[in-house]
Structures are given as structure tokens and as C-alpha cells.
């Protein structure tokens, strides 16, 4: 039986098989999953914002920011015996949650989160093998560290497995 570990907003968790990493309520936030299929170990981050604003660069790095989450997870995965070259990534979330008339100058966070995640993965040389991003609805994720499969659930949408 798999144990279930919940990943909150601005957090990441690392786990070995058999574990299901879960996160709920991804709107404009992004869920980034990294998996080593040999070590059967993975990480899941629930990031809130693409990057810190100017002047915050010196703060302690956290998974709150998409630009840092991949590096933080890779460091921890390596400590757990994973090999960076074996890691693969899956990405979900990054929705546009408001109608055009209700958007502000801070709109586009979802799209910017997705871009920041892809840039961080590319910088690390980690292939993005599947994604379910954008659109206008929230998602919840279940990441199986044995199979590497992510189950994406959304209201009134078919369940997706990637």
C-alpha cells in the first residue's frame, strides 16, 4: 500500500516508492514533478509565483518561486540517491483563472509560472516529458513515485494520466 504525502502551496516534498505525492488547488500555481525511474524516487513542488521581485533576490530560496523550485528539488533528490541525468519532469497548472474584464496588471501569472518552470528545467537539462497547463480551470495532482504517472483531476473534466 502506498503512503500519501500532501504538498502544500509554496512547498516541495521528496519521496521514495511506494508513495503518492499529492497537491490540490493548482490555479495559476504550477505543479512540477521530477522522477528518477531507476531510484523510484521523485519530488513534487507546488509553486506560487514565477520569481521574486527585485530586491528579494537575497532572501532564502523556497519553492514559493517557480524559478528556484527545480534546483531545490534536484539538490534533495541527489541527496536521496537519484542521478540528475535520469530525472524527467512533468508539469501541470498555470491556468488563467479570471475573466479578461477582471484581470489586473498582475495577470498572466499562470503563463509566467509555466515559462519559468520550463526555463528552470532547460537550465538543468531535465526533459519535460508531459504537461497539462494553461486553460481556465484549476487542477489537483497525484504523483505515483513507483510508476512516475501523474493523475490530473479537475472539476467537470475527464481525469488525465500522464
UniProtKB/Swiss-Prot annotation:
Keywords: Chemotaxis, Hydrolase
GO MF terms held by the record: protein-glutamine glutaminase activity
Reactions that this protein is recorded to catalyse: L-glutaminyl-[protein] + H2O = L-glutamyl-[protein] + NH4(+)
E.C. code: 3.5.1.44
Listed HAMAP family: CheD
Family: Belongs to the CheD family.
Protein name per UniProt: Probable chemoreceptor glutamine deamidase CheD 3
UniProt lineage: Bacteria, Pseudomonadati, Thermodesulfobacteriota, Desulfuromonadia, Geobacterales
Amino acid at each position: 500500500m502506498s503512503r500519501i504525502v500532501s504538498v502544500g502551496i509554496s512547498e516541495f516534498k521528496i519521496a521514495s516508492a511506494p508513495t503518492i505525492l499529492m497537491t490540490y488547488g493548482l490555479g495559476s500555481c504550477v505543479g512540477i514533478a521530477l522522477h528518477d525511474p531507476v531510484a523510484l524516487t521523485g519530488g513534487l513542488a507546488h509553486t506560487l509565483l514565477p520569481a521574486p521581485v527585485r530586491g528579494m533576490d537575497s532572501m532564502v530560496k523556497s519553492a514559493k518561486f517557480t524559478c528556484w523550485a527545480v534546483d531545490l528539488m534536484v539538490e534533495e533528490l541527489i541527496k536521496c540517491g537519484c542521478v540528475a541525468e535520469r530525472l524527467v519532469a512533468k508539469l501541470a497548472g498555470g491556468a488563467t483563472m479570471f475573466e479578461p474584464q477582471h484581470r489586473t496588471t498582475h495577470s498572466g501569472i499562470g503563463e509566467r509560472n509555466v515559462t519559468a518552470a520550463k526555463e528552470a528545467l532547460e537550465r538543468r537539462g531535465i526533459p519535460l516529458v508531459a504537461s497539462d497547463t494553461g486553460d481556465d480551470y484549476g487542477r489537483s495532482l497525484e504523483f505515483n513515485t513507483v510508476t512516475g504517472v501523474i493523475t490530473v483531476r479537475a472539476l467537470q473534466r475527464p481525469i488525465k494520466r500522464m
